[in-house]
Amino acid sequence: MKLKATLQWLWLNLKFLAGAFCLTGFLIWLFPSAMLDLYAKWATLMQAAGAKNIAELATQADMFEHILSINALTTIIFFAIGLVLQSPITMSFVGIFYALVSFLAPFAIGRSFGVNDWLLVGSEAFTLLLSASLSSAFAGELFGVRATMSEIWAYWKTSWSKFMPKPVENWKTILRGWTPALSIGAIILAGLLIFVAWFETYGY
């Protein structure tokens, strides 16, 4: 039951991510210069938030630690966003970001993406997708919202005016029931985070 709910949210979030990815790719094809400017501003914002250039890191161990910490923080943020059932919106931004990174690579790094690049991007995106979908599935059961656009839209229309919507009456039972699934999910996410940091540092 928990797996089914998580997969349903993962599929919904994936559609938002893929849609934004494809639309952004089309816009890059139409307006490459404007989209490159947008990517440059996004990169500046990420650096202001704490991301560092490779040149700023003294050793590969420093690079591994930095990538792991930044990605772990991002994954936690996406999990928290999923708890308030805003993951489809967030995954749209993920699709936009990775489309900019992928399709503007010839301008940004001087070459098109190779197999390793696509594997890295796919692994990073899947980690965020899984984190947001797992928490959304838990929150969906907690607040009585299924992974359908009609129910999500109905929830969004009524939730903006409330800091935290009221959960269903048996929320304690739901929380206990989700504890094993959330624990397993945390282990899987930790493994993915370590793999991504290792691959980006040592795998190229």
What feature does the model see in each segment?
Residues 191-204:
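Juxtamembrane boundary at the C-terminal end of a transmembrane helix
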Residues 34-58, 104-117:
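Membrane-interface interhelical connector segments
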Residues 120-148:
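Alpha-helical transmembrane segments of helical membrane proteins, especially in multi-pass transport
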Residues 42-53, 145-171:
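Juxtamembrane inter-helical linkers in multi-pass membrane proteins
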